[in-house]
């Protein structure tokens, strides 16, 4: 066997071992250097045995192997403290130090042992060594029967706040059980009682054989600390439900609901209130709280299913009333016309008088500084058509106590927080209010002050244009067939008939304004709000409310009202009273759709409030129906 002697020919440079690596590089750095050196010598065809011998005998590799062996022994060795009283030992050393010589080392040792950090370290060492961190429980008595159920003693400190739990009697066993735990209450925050727990004693008094009312009386008479002895439920309920927010579409008063399990735990709410649903485990009774006061504990409200069932039962229990709900609008309109007292001096003389009024009105519809802007949607014929066609429908719905609006609608509407992004279209602004409250004047002033930002949609009509009118400016003039096609295709937000002609505002007309980057302002009758509530338009509804009658008598002493009989007629006291009553009915019937309410006591103040409300609607977070922002929902 031949042995190469090339290893003896290695120069000092070739024999140079790699520089010890930086400790921060770790084992990966060492292996990387080793591979580099091996590849270098391999390329030179150097004898590997000599190289490997020198490498394995290098001091830095020997030290690394010693550290590895030490770690392995440390890993296999079970750690046992040398002493469990290191703190006592340190105190004994401190007592002996004064007897020793006063060398600098003795002084330094005294300072170290007296330092707070050193004392804390030794105390922690003794605690771990003695295993004082493990709780010591007393031994169980030997005479406990195997059949006895485990009991829990719960102590709660009751102040002026309610406990936040309801109880019930088991129908078969007669046991007193915790029926439900109210979210946010004292019991829920303690985490010690759960629905289904069996009460055995309250403050040392056995509840066996007692009625729930008697147990409630014991709790009501107790103050300070209340001690419960309970048999816990085998598996405490775990709720994984997400928080849901809804808008109430009806009024609810727990005091008037005979079916509520606990009247005191009920949560009253009004139409339009935003509720936070925190518990839907019960199919009939949910737990919720108002977002206006999230600090209080939740209350019981009927579930969506239960309220719909109540609505159906109430609807079918009412007597059939075709004269209020199903009377034709044409018959109602004729009765209303017959009931109006006509002053012959104020009746329009002929159609020319009406046309002359519209012609004068058309001149006022051009506004702007320097440049003329036309304000569409204010023609007298359109306003009279809307008022005449819709008043009868509104009157019928308001007179019917069991209106179909409340009978078939969902009692809750799920909502989410929405903020319009700068790249999105503006939200449609809808103004609602009784006739004479100033909706049209507010809309006119708003558009007139900034026509480049605000605009009304151009309505449609089937009548022929007059000589001074232009298609697409005052109206979109279409045939009756085209208009009816838009109606049946649900493309009209509102429509009606006046003097044999159809008038209305289409969805496309609103989109035309929004596509220009402007804010579309329109007024609707309350019953037409639903047709505009789509995810494309995302309307923000503002209710213009009149002040009290005495304030209106002062602010509207020179104002005039427009009717189909009177071109201009001053307000009478009965008109003001009727306006106030109609506003109350609108708010009661359709208030759940109103996002904002403005009292028009002073026109300039109301216009300023309107501008502020519109700005908030376009720029700030608002509650909107969840269907408007959900990507999986078709509007």
UniProtKB/Swiss-Prot annotation:
Residues 23-79, 86-136 form the L27 domain. It comes from Mus musculus. Belongs to the MAGUK family. This is MAGUK p55 subfamily member 4. Keywords: Coiled coil, Cytoplasm, Repeat, SH3 domain. Detected in the retina (at protein level). Highly enriched in the retina where it is mainly expressed by rod photoreceptors; detected in the inner segment of the photoreceptor layer and in the outer nuclear layer. Also detected at much lower levels in pineal gland, cerebellum, cortex, hippocampus, olfactory bulb, heart, liver and spleen. Expressed in the CA1-CA3 regions of pyramidal cell layers and in the granule cell layer of dentate gyrus in the hippocampus. In the cerebellum, expressed in Purkinje cells and throughout the granule cell layer. In the olfactory bulb, expressed in mitral cells. Residues 153-234 form the PDZ domain. Residues 426-615 form the Guanylate kinase-like domain. The keyword Flavoprotein does not apply. GO terms for biological process: protein localization to synapse. The keyword Coiled coil applies. May play a role in retinal photoreceptors development. The gene is Mpp4. Residues 241-311 form the SH3 domain. The lineage of its organism: Eukaryota, Metazoa, Chordata, Craniata, Vertebrata. It comes from the Eukaryota. Residues 567-622 form a coiled coil.
